[in-house]
């Protein structure tokens, strides 16, 4: 009789343990952070000319699905500022600050290490790779040029100062608005059950040339960015 009672007790314990182990398939996530971008182009023929990194803001919402074991696929929508500084430090030095805003749709594939947050609590690490499509929504430029290279502006001393928003309807510089790129990164997080918290790093490399084919330049020019983010997620 004691063996029967013991078997029943063990059965209830096992059921209790299984009830506590929740298995999820989906995750919805919100994240925000800092972007650091630069224009990747050849300026070797221009003396003392540089493109420098400037910080911006990024935010995203997305969903992820646990395909099998530790493998997951995700997609979402992201806002990212790809800002950078152009400087010419020659005899007549000048600079331009570029504030570029994009809306992107990323698609990524990730693999969880240490713990699988869809099955268990604890610390996890997720390397991931993916691609993205993005749309160039707006560009704002601010800076100054030497007066002797431009006409039609009222200058302050020997320099012309300006602060303008680019008109994409005219698109005089023949900029592309639809672009593609690839990304790779890593996230480190902790699963509390239904809730995850994490920090991450991503490097984004632009596949698309920023100019249209009819543009007068033959130089390769792409925008590359590093994103550092913090995020929270809910699983179901």
Model-derived regions: residue spans:
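Hydrophobic, well-structured mid-protein blocks that either form specific transmembrane helices
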Residues: 97-139, 143
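Bacterial Sec-dependent N-terminal signal peptides
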Residues: 1-27, 228, 232-236
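Extended, basic/helix-rich recognition subdomains
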Residues: 189-212
